[in-house]
Amino acid sequence: MQWRAVWRHTHRHDSAHAVRLLDVVIDGHNDLAWAMRQLCDYDLSMVDLSQSVPGIHTDIPRLRAGEVSGQFWSVYAPSTLSGAEAVVVTLEQIDFVRRFVARFPGDLALATSADEVVAARASGRIASLIGLEGGHCIDESLGVLRIMHALGARYMTLTHNHNAPWADSATDEPVLGGLSSFGEDVVREMNRLGMLVDLSHVSADVMRHALAVTAAPAIFSHSCARALVDVPRNVPDDVLTALAANGGICMIAFVPDFVSAPFATWFGEQERGVVGSPAPVVTVDDLADHIDHVRDVAGIDHVGIGGDFDGSAYMPPELNDVSTYPRLLAALSARGWTPRDLGYLCSGNILRVLRAAEDTAHAHG
């Protein structure tokens, strides 16, 4: 039985508004653009994304099956790149997203605001938003940041796996102990533009520093709870508490080494060349535990979904592509999540945060 049918049977007396909220899943992070670079050098004539495509997590039929009505498409340049090379690769990624959307106008609609997300949903199309992954892609230039915004980018992850010159990464040796003065300027300019400040990938000190600087709600586009799995990419409880005070949202990733402590240990062994043991199984309930934890610490208004599909070589077997969101939502329903709360998780919270960022930009004039 589909998750929506389960909820309507279990919560049949809830409001029609709450049920309508369930029709919308807005995911915070998907790396299809990079997967297509690797698969076919962005050539949409070689890979038909209107059909099921083996070897990747994402295509239009599976987005439809997963009840996805909004997607932040990550535009990514490896953090080993810098300067003009990182800018060019990022622009190529933006170009791919825009061509992808234009190629399938009956299924996809470019969105740059909360109202455009809602309008796309009303027209039966998947709202397609753009998120920059890694502040190295602006080459230490607020002018480049502004151009990226003009091309449709509506969030920027401040770092990727390596430090930016102005912000420390979670997975690199700390240099600054937070943001530099230019890093603070980046956050303020993002506020002025209406771009969401994304704190996935950054060090815990940058998380705290950025939350102290930003005038608009921040996001974690694809992270989990560090109290459950103690890896640098996850979010400590004190930061979740600060995020709630900020009005922001932590969008939970499906990446197994963020979700499961045994898998994180196994994954670390693989990276060190230790072989022989099979990968621990990561379940839907493991992921649901992180969502429950963020709700319990930060509140129902501050949790969302950011799967990171096509951004990880591993995914939980039950959540192995974009068609599988209903399995997660059914598991949460079985735990007692109401239709209204599931609506906040799926779309209500991120739409609120988008609107708040827009309001902050308008207040800046």
Protein language model features and the residues they cover:
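Divalent metal-binding pocket/active-site signature
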Residues: C137-D139, A150-R233
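N-terminal hydrophobic targeting/anchoring segments and the immediately downstream early-domain regions
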Residues: M1-L176, D230-G365
